[in-house]
């Protein structure tokens, strides 16, 4: 667990240049056969807006706020949780004019202590794909603690066919995780998995390529 957390902290808060604040990651739009702006709009309309509007939202690993800007613009209150001090500081500056945001620096597995049974929606995209199984399991326990009864979590994660034989060869590569494992972690902590799929817009077949989205309720 510690090595995965340490490696991700080094990569995303020190080594990575964030050339377009996360918008440089366009390959999932390419694989969906649509423009990046269409892909991004589809994700917001299917995975964020139905759950974040007028809600208390917690985002895990916002990075430079690629999705946070949409969440903050429609939610009642947003809590941004990140492992990287520089990423959190960037978000503080970027969203300084918004009064409905607070920030929490995690050590890599925990959510704010005060966020117990008060969160309507937990969202994370492009972060759990890099987390090891033990880190995800720890976060799942925290998500269960943070969500209100009836609350929802949407997690984007890796979908590796055979995690047991998979070898991560560099930091930032997909971790040895699949939907079955994520389902098990969620159910272990009393959460219900409602849907797991690589596609969120069935009509246009827009999704996250070789990864998966898990929708969870409490």
Name each model feature, range by range.
Residues 123:
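A conserved beta-strand element that flanks and buttresses the S-adenosyl-L-methionine
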Residues 126-127:
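Short catalytic micro-motifs in class I SAM-dependent methyltransferases
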Residues 1-54, 60-115, 131-138, 142, ...:
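Class I (Rossmann-like) S-adenosyl-L-methionine-dependent methyltransferase catalytic domain
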């Amino acid at each position: 667990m510690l090595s995965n957390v340490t490696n991700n902290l080094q990569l995303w808060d020190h080594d990575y240049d964030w050339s377009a604040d996360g918008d440089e990651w366009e390959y999932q739009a390419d694989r969906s056969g649509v423009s990046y702006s269409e892909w991004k709009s589809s994700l917001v309309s299917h995975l964020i807006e139905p759950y974040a509007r007028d809600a208390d939202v917690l985002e895990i690993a916002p990075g430079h706020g690629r999705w946070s800007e949409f969440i903050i613009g429609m939610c009642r209150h947003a809590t941004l949780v990140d492992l990287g001090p520089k990423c959190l500081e960037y978000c503080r500056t970027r969203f300084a004019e918004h009064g409905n945001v607070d920030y929490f620096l995690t050590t890599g597995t925990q959510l704010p202590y005060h966020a117990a049974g008060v969160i309507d929606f937990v969202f994370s995209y492009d972060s759990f794909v890099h987390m090891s199984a033990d880190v995800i399991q720890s976060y799942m326990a925290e998500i269960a603690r943070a969500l209100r009864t009836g609350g929802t979590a949407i997690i984007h994660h890796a979908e590796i066919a055979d995690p047991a034989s998979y070898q991560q060869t560099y930091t930032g590569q997909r971790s040895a995780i699949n939907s079955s494992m994520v389902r098990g972690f969620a159910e272990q902590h009393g959460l219900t998995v409602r849907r797991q799929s690589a596609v969120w817009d069935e009509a246009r077949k827009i999704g996250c390529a070789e990864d998966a989205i898990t929708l969870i309720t409490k």
